[in-house]
């Protein structure tokens, strides 16, 4: 039977043997684990790199595209600014605005600050221009008569103004004859009576029947007054020739339009011949009055 000391030695040696036998697998395990981890790391890292490289490439591509778009926007903005500057310069040299420029000013692509600044600049340029400046192509035609540019009437018209509603014939004669006429004198015996004869003839014809006046009698009176008037040596006013022509024209119109009764005209054939003679005398006296007016003018 072995002693206790021998049993202890046997147990110790057995333990050492077990430990020695178990140390080799542990070391081998550690070596194999380290090698496998390294190999696995080398295997995994390329896979991660291959997975990360497309994502980084996409990000880089997006970053590059964004930079190009920003550069393009900057270039477009600079070109727009240059175009607007050239357009404003051209419009200022021409001196007028255009609808194209107005549409461009209000385009939504332009910023609100640029639109406000351009409007303020146009307002200042418009306010500095004078009010009375007109375009060269503006028509100057007018459709109404401007009375401000008409000359003033002559004072001779006021002196020769006619007013037949006077109480007596002498006042009519004095006021109808112009003051600068040579026919007016201090002595009433030396005054010309041809004008008063015309007034008397007209007054006698006016005192007749106002409803139906005798046109032929009026023409006879005008013939007598005109003959005396044309033979007068006084320097009468030109207005009297106009009065005579107007009186003859009025008598001619009355003679042409009036229908006289047959008993007042006499026989029908005789009336036609008599009216023809009156019209002939009328035309002759009108010619004489016109000629005298021209010669004395």
Swiss-Prot record:
Gene that produces this protein: vicR
Location in or out of the cell: Nucleus
Name used for this protein in its record: Probable transcription factor vicR
GO CC terms in record: nucleus
Amino acid composition bias (Basic and acidic residues), ranges on this chain: 58-67, 110-124
Main location: nucleus
UniProt keywords, alphabetically: Nucleus, Transcription, Transcription regulation, Virulence
Segments of skewed composition (Polar residues): 69-80
Disordered: region residues: 45-80, 100-134
Membrane-spanning intervals of the chain: none
Functional summary from the UniProt entry: Probable transcription factor; part of the gene cluster that mediates the biosynthesis of the secondary metabolite victorin, the molecular basis for Victoria blight of oats. May play a role in the regulation of the production of victorin.
């Amino acid at each position: 039977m072995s002693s206790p000391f021998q049993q202890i030695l046997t147990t110790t040696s057995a333990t050492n043997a077990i430990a020695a036998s178990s140390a080799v697998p542990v070391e081998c395990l550690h070596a194999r684990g380290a090698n496998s981890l390294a190999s696995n790391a080398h295997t995994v890292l390329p896979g991660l790199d291959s997975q990360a490289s497309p994502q980084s490439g996409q990000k880089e591509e997006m970053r590059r595209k964004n930079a190009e778009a920003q550069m393009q926007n900057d270039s477009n903005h600079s070109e727009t600014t240059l175009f607007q500057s050239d357009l404003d310069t051209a419009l200022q040299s021409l001196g007028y605005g255009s609808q194209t420029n107005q549409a461009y000013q209000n385009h939504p692509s332009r910023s609100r600050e640029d639109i406000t600044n351009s409007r303020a600049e146009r307002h200042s340029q418009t306010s500095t221009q004078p009010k009375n400046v007109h375009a060269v192509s503006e028509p100057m035609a007018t459709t109404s008569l401007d009375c401000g540019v008409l000359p003033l009437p002559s004072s001779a018209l006021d002196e020769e103004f006619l007013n037949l509603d006077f109480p007596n014939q002498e006042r009519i004669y004095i006021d109808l004859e112009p003051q600068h006429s040579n026919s007016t004198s201090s002595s009433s015996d030396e005054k010309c009576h041809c004008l008063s004869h015309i007034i008397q003839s007209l007054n006698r014809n006016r005192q007749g029947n106002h409803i139906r006046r005798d046109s032929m009698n009026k023409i006879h009176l005008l013939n007598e007054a005109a003959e005396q008037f044309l033979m007068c040596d006084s320097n009468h006013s030109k207005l009297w020739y106009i009065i005579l022509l107007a009186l003859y024209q009025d008598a001619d119109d009355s003679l042409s339009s009036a229908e006289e009764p047959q008993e007042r005209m006499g026989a029908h054939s005789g009336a036609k011949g008599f009216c023809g003679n009156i019209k002939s005398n009328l035309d002759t006296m009108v010619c004489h009055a016109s000629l005298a007016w021209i010669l004395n003018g």
